[in-house]
Amino acid sequence: MRVFNIERFATHDGDGIRTVVFLKGCPLRCPWCSNPESREPDRQLFHTAGKCLGCGSCQKVCPAGAVRYEGGRVHFRVEICTECGACADICPGEALEFVGRQMEAEEIVREVLRDRDYYEESGGGVTLSGGEPFAQAGELVRLLLLLKQQGLNTAVETAGQYPTERLEEAFPYEIGRASCRERV
């Protein structure tokens, strides 16, 4: 699965203390999206302009010449970026980061099981968010199955913008509902 973040000890994405697994990929472009780095399905270079110090270090270390600092701004040529990570590693302001990594469902389960004691004490569990989790429907259902086999409470944050059949595949896993409307 393509994951961009795993947030531990979350309290706003379902009941109790939860671990939120943020998945990459979303077909929507909502202007209020709180996770714009989740939109693209693949790993991507994400630049936070407000953190950029304007030092030009990123340009100096890029072996592909994909980073250019000009006119007080950083410009990226993503089509030639090799994703080596040198620019993100050297950035003193942490303005550059590669967002997204491939994780197997079993690897995600191992990660979230580290917080099992918190779930049991608080009535919490695991929330799958994004992006749009159903953009990875087949892998999502497999992950839900593995989480349920561990006896974990699950919730999926979704806009529901997928065919009913895809959504129904997840129904046997007793997923809870975590609504973004409650936070707006």
Residue ranges of each PLM-predicted region?
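Short, flexible active-site-adjacent loop segments at beta-strand->alpha-helix junctions, enriched
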Residues: P27, G160-Y162, R183
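Conserved Radical SAM active-site core
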Residues: E40-V156, G160-F171
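Conserved, mostly hydrophobic/aromatic
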Residues: V21, C30, E132, V156, ...
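Residue-level detector of conserved catalytic or cofactor/ligand-binding positions
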Residues: I175-V184
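Primarily extracellular surface-attachment and macromolecule-engagement regions
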Residues: M1-R2, M103
